[in-house]
Structures are given as structure tokens and as C-alpha cells.
Regions:
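Structured mid-to-C-terminal alpha-helical surface segments
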Residues: 1-27, 38-40, 53-222
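Glycine-rich beta-strand-to-loop/alpha-helix junction loops that act as flexible
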Residues: 29-33
Length: 222
């Protein structure tokens, strides 16, 4: 658990430095780490995910960002790929690598202005984030694409926050089918390692009961 606390401090340190270096102007913070740092998602995640608001000179952006990050960290990996820019940062102050992924595809999505913060850090950063309604859409797409238990967890988290799960009947049925495919190992190991001990037992026993009931109710209503 201490490693995860340190990793959260690492995330905020890097976000703060990206902001100070003016690398976030055209980026939108998304994914599970955004939900945790900006909206209180109660599971751990290990990477920083960004979308873009407009196309950029990617070779130049990558070059500048790489040189900037190398002032502070060792780069375990870095790549300017066709669809994404990737960095893996290593620091002697922190036990884990930190992955940064910037998706080059320009997406028309709604954004909010949010503060990334943690009770484990004194750093706070105001930044553009994916609006929660669009985050719900993204998480549904992700779960249907890769079937990862963490995406289902995030969908239920957003649902409990009052974010509507707007989807057609076909998508609702696919979600129900996907939830049924999740195994005991998904809950005990994959999800269990991302949760505090106090929450692990609940999800092992109840799984995504709230989400499943909501999906059934929506299907009955239609």
C-alpha cells in the first residue's frame, strides 16, 4: 500500500511538471487516474492518459517533451508511435515506473476544469479533464472492447455518482454479457489488488450488483 501512496505522489509531481512546462495546453486528462485524482475514484491505477483537442506537430512535441522529462527522470521507455506518444518514467524517489500515454487522435469531447489532488500530497494542479458523461461512454467502449474488470468498476463508480448510463438495447445486453464473463480471479486478483482491503470482500461477494440491477431495469423499461 505504501508503494501505491508513493506512486500517487509521483503522478501528481509529473502532472505538475507537465503543467509548468506548458505541455498540457492542448491535452485533456482522462482514464482511471483522472477519475481517482479529480473525482475520488477509490481504486488504484498506474498510468497517466491524455486525449488531444487538436492536431499538433507531433515530432516536435515529442522531442520537446522527451528533452524536458529527461531533466528530471530516467526514461525507461519512450516512443512516438503512429497513434500514441508513450513515456515510461523512472525515479529513485519512487518504487514504480510511471507510464504516460498521449493519444494523437483528435476527439470531439466535452471537457471540465478539474483539480488533480491527493490527501497524500501537497501538490494540486488545475487542468482540463474529460467530462464525466463522456468518461462513461469511454469506459463502456473500453469494457466492451477488452473486458477488463477495472473498466466495469469505473462504470459502476460513475453510475453511483449520478452519471447516466445512456446506451441502446444492444449495448446494454453486451454489458450484461460482459459482466457475466468476469471470473472469480477477476474479482479476487485483478480487482482485489487495486482496492483497499476494506472493499475487496464486498466485491468478491457482491460483484457489480448495483450496475447489474441498473442494466436489468433499463432493459425492462425498454
Amino acid at each position: 500500500m505504501r508503494d501505491l501512496v508513493k506512486h500517487e505522489q509521483f503522478e501528481l509531481e509529473v502532472i505538475d511538471r507537465l503543467q509548468s512546462g506548458r505541455f498540457l495546453a492542448n491535452l485533456i486528462f482522462g482514464g482511471g487516474t483522472m477519475l481517482r485524482l479529480c473525482h475520488g475514484l477509490d481504486r488504484y491505477s498506474v498510468g497517466l492518459d491524455f486525449w488531444v483537442t487538436k492536431d499538433m506537430d507531433w515530432p516536435e512535441y515529442y522531442r520537446r517533451l522527451e528533452q524536458y522529462l529527461m531533466q528530471f527522470y530516467k526514461l525507461a521507455d519512450s516512443a512516438n508511435k503512429h497513434f500514441t506518444i508513450l513515456f515510461e518514467l523512472k525515479s529513485p524517489q519512487y518504487p514504480r515506473l510511471l507510464k504516460i500515454e498521449i493519444r494523437k487522435e483528435t476527439r470531439v469531447i466535452k471537457t471540465d476544469t478539474s483539480i488533480a489532488y491527493s490527501p497524500n500530497s501537497t501538490v494540486q494542479v488545475m487542468m482540463k479533464t474529460v467530462a464525466l458523461k463522456d468518461m462513461m461512454k469511454s469506459k463502456i467502449e473500453a469494457f466492451l472492447s477488452r473486458g477488463e474488470v477495472r473498466d466495469a468498476y469505473d462504470i459502476e463508480f460513475l453510475l453511483k455518482r449520478g452519471i447516466p448510463l445512456n446506451a441502446d438495447n444492444e449495448t446494454l445486453n453486451k454489458l450484461v454479457t460482459g459482466l457475466k464473463k468476469l471470473s472469480k480471479t477477476d474479482f479476487s486478483v485483478k480487482l482485489g489488488t487495486l482496492l483497499d482491503a476494506s472493499k475487496r470482500k464486498y466485491y468478491q461477494e457482491n460483484k457489480f450488483r448495483i450496475l447489474e440491477m441498473h442494466l436489468r431495469d433499463k432493459l425492462k423499461g425498454e
